[in-house]
Amino acid sequence: MAEPHQEFDVTEDHAGTYGLGDRKDQGGYTMLQDQEGDTDAGLKESPLQTPAEDGSEEPGSETSDAKSTPTAEDVTAPLVDERAPGEQAAAQPHMEIPXGTTAEEAGIGDTPSLEDEAAGHVTQEPESGKVVREGFLGEPGPPGLSHQLVSGMPGAPLLPEGPREATRQPSGIGPEDTEGGRHAPELLKHQLLGDLHQEGPPLKGAGGKERPGSKEEVDEDRDVDESSPQDSPPSKVSPAQDGWPPQAAAREATSIPGFPAEGAIPLPVDFLSKVSTEIPASEPDRPSAGGAEGQDAPPEFTFHVEITPNVQKEQAHSEEHLRRAAFPGAPGEGPEAQGPSLGEDAKEADLPEPSEKQPAAAPRGKPISRVPQLKARMVSKSKDGTGSDDKKAKTSTRSSAKTLKNRPCLSPKHPTPGSSDPLIQPSSPAVCPEPPSSPKYVSSVTPRTGSSGAKEMKLKGADGKTKIATPRGAAPPGQKGQANATRIPAKTPPAPKTPPSSGEPPKSGDRSGYSSPGSPGTPGSRSRTPSLPTPPTREPKKVAVVRTPPKSPSSAKSRLQTAPVPMPDLKNVKSKIGSTENLKHQPGGGKVQIINKKLDLSNVQSKCGSKDNIKHVPGGGSVQIVYKPVDLSKVTSKCGSLGNIHHKPGGGQVEVKSEKLDFKDRVQSKIGSLDNITHVPGGGHKKIETHKLTFRENAKAKTDHGAEIVYKSPVVSGDTSPRHLSNVSSTGSIDMVDSPQLATLADEVSASLAKQGL
């Protein structure tokens, strides 16, 4: 669930600044959610801060717990810090909240508490980052603020964040990482751890612890918030109480590596080693924190380091920006990466590094109630870590447990007895995530009553454990307030879904549903609003969480549960076409019987007597064809053809002989034409020669009148041999004198030629 919010408004929410985006899938989260997210962040830290020596219950823890629970909803509707990072900084003016001041009283954790949870623990998780940032900005709410405020608080003994945190961190961070960190937080934690190792100095101080812690807690808190936003409340309470940015406090620790804060009892190095061993990634930062913060700081650092690796990258920027923007000491926080923070160092000197304080105050394994711290952290979470914690809690309950463990150390800023109780919840390593959820709610509401808040936190811690086992939704009720926290513990354990809805109605009020991320400024403002308003607001948040309930098992179940649909009563069903009669029909045809009855034809009579053949069996199987040759011996033919009776037609033996008849030899023509039998018609071999007669040309009149007749006849081929007439001269001239008949002959010839067409 953290992932949805992760991408919500990391840019807006200083995700880049806090590394929230890198941290627990909060890349998209808005650090602006700090206002509301601070509650989660603070809540997350609150569990860590639970081991506050103050013994004062950290209402923040319970509230944070409650807040953490809404993480599902927050994740669903991550509250973008309803203000831009700058707005948050402005909204979270640098203000040091008295150690006894409740997160709500400080007015830092109010809005974030339930609203952040309801609106979206995503916001709360981002608010974890915001917690640091708001701590820098002076928002007590930021988880980082919680730790650092606790650390920075002179009167606030360092929560045995080292011990508790070490103790928790092994179980809380381990589980949180395992549960919340397992999701994105653990990777982010390792990344953050790498960053923290790189930026170890910043993490070292309370600021380093907180900043890294806040960022890392924001990461881890997001895990915690995702798993159980309870962790954040302590952080929030712490910021509320101390009023100094968790990162500032962390930085104080960072800048003053060895000193445990005035009232803080430095945790032994063992805690750091313990935490380091348990939390490899977070441990490196924590050792740095431990160096800065002393032995007490390391446990706290462990938690913070766990959160800070990615956060530190973004936190370095975000913290610096927030601190510089909101707090004069913010720059010191910004340098958290650098390690010492001017403002935080001063604070560290001034305040007994609440985180260190608490670690010293509470044994490693002993949870310290820090209701005020939880409140501060709630505020921080609401403002800075709500989204982050919310997301974290959603992402992994273990993560939130870790955050709570570490944040209790941060929570020390509220050294009130209430502050110790929140830690007490987280004190159980396994339970840390759970107490954080319940502390969250306490943080927002209970910060005012530290002792009762712590107690409620404890109750919630017990419930929180159950809650942590259950969805975060259970934790959100704690955020409502001490009363809510107390109620919420019962509510939360039975039905995580109900706590978000009942405990988080304030959330929805503040966050006004998931829409509040849309207006980052508003949730933050509400978050920073007086602590008292926060519980009611958180209840609205819970309403927002009510939206989350779907995420929580109870809500999911209730939503998923649909009235059983009764099976249709088929007995009363009537079919228009009577099909119900065959309702039980089982097709298959297996029982079909084919009855073959033979017809009795004995009485049948045929019209045409065919009955006689009724028994006839066609087929001719028994038909016999008898071939009897006909005896023709006695047959006589009418015309004596009997003689040819054996004649075989076909003429097989007939031979056709063709003989040419020599009719020329045998035939004689009647008229003696035989003589001309060889006659070739047309004169066969004879040539017909035509000679052109030129007599006309040469003819002369009978009477020689002296005129010569000129006659031109067509040229006749010379092929033909001219027949020379006796009376025709070679020249063709006719000697009329010699042939008196020539004239007549010539005329005849001319006539014949003319006929022939010559």
Swiss-Prot record:
Localization annotation: Cytoplasm, Cytosol; Cell membrane; Cytoplasm, Cytoskeleton; Cell projection, Axon
Give the organism, scientific name: Pongo pygmaeus (Bornean orangutan)
Which sections of the protein are Tau/MAP repeats? Answer: 561-591, 592-622, 623-653, 654-685
Which sequence positions carry the modification called Phosphotyrosine?
A: 18, 29, 514, 711
Locate the cross-link: Glycyl lysine isopeptide (Lys-Gly) (interchain with G-Cter in ubiquitin).
44, 571, 576, 584, 598, 615, 628, 634, 638, 648, 660, 664, 670, 686, 692, 702
Q: How does it sit in the membrane?
A: Peripheral membrane protein
The function of this protein is: Promotes microtubule assembly and stability, and might be involved in the establishment and maintenance of neuronal polarity. The C-terminus binds axonal microtubules while the N-terminus binds neural plasma membrane components, suggesting that tau functions as a linker protein between both. Axonal polarity is predetermined by tau localization (in the neuronal cell) in the domain of the cell body defined by the centrosome. The short isoforms allow plasticity of the cytoskeleton whereas the longer isoforms may preferentially play a role in its stabilization.
Q: What is the name attached to this protein's record? A: Microtubule-associated protein tau
Q: Which residues carry this modification: N-acetylalanine?
A: 2
Modified sites of kind N6-methyllysine: 576
Pro residues bias spans: 491-503
- Is-annotated flag, keyword Ubl conjugation? yes
Q: Please note every region of biased composition (Polar residues).
A: 61-71, 440-452, 718-733
Q: Which residues carry this modification: Phosphoserine?
A: 46, 61, 214, 502, 508, 512, 515-516, 519, 531, 552, 554, 579, 602, 606, 610, 622, 641, 669, 673, 713, 717, 721, 726, 733, 739
The UniProt keywords, alphabetically, are: Acetylation, Cell membrane, Cell projection, Cytoplasm, Cytoskeleton, Isopeptide bond, Membrane, Methylation, Microtubule, Phosphoprotein, Repeat, Ubl conjugation
Name the Gene Ontology molecular function terms of this record: microtubule binding
Annotated positions of the Omega-N-methylarginine modification: 472, 666
Q: Where is this region: Disordered?
A: 1-573, 715-734
Positions of post-translational N6,N6-dimethyllysine modification = 480, 628
Where is the sequence biased in composition, kind Low complexity?
325-340, 504-531
Compositional bias ranges of the Acidic residues kind: 217-228
Q: Cite the record's Basic and acidic residues compositional bias ranges.
A: 1-26, 179-189, 207-216, 314-323, 344-356, 381-393, 455-466
Q: Which residues carry this modification: Phosphothreonine?
A: 69, 71, 111, 470, 486, 492, 498, 522, 529, 534, 548, 720, 744
